[in-house]
Amino acid sequence: PGGSGRELIWFPDPVGPRDCYRAALPDPVLLHHAFPEVGRITARMAATRRDRLTAPLPMLAPSHLEGGPGAVRVEVRGRRDGVEDVVVLGASGRPAVAAAAVAATAVEWLLTGRNRVRGMVGLAEMVEPLAFLEDLAGRGLEAEVFEGDRALA
């Protein structure tokens, strides 16, 4: 259920590590439609204990216009060439600027006929992912790959 399952997750700078909880978001449904062979898709959202405590209450003060820096992180686990593998990608930036870059790039793809399918689909089904990420990088929104060693030195 949404709000359970606390986990410390690392996001790209300047956001860094955040406590995250399962979130009742539509993203897993859209992703499952695009990738039906995937066994489990979950969504998590960063929140402080105060955020979780006050979530059901009405807001007494308006939130910030944009909310400050934001980040997204995608972790994919599975087998590649018979070996268990984990790939973690992320991006950070001002949420409104990032959303505008994604929307503008998607519209550009539609207008130039670069979309893979027609009709009502999610973005993951519409575009070729690597080429889309390259176009986003051209607009200043770059994906980052988390690399590291699991062993502690």
Language model feature labels by segment:
Residues P1-A153:
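C-terminal catalytic/substrate-binding lobe primarily of soluble NAD(P)-dependent oxidoreductases
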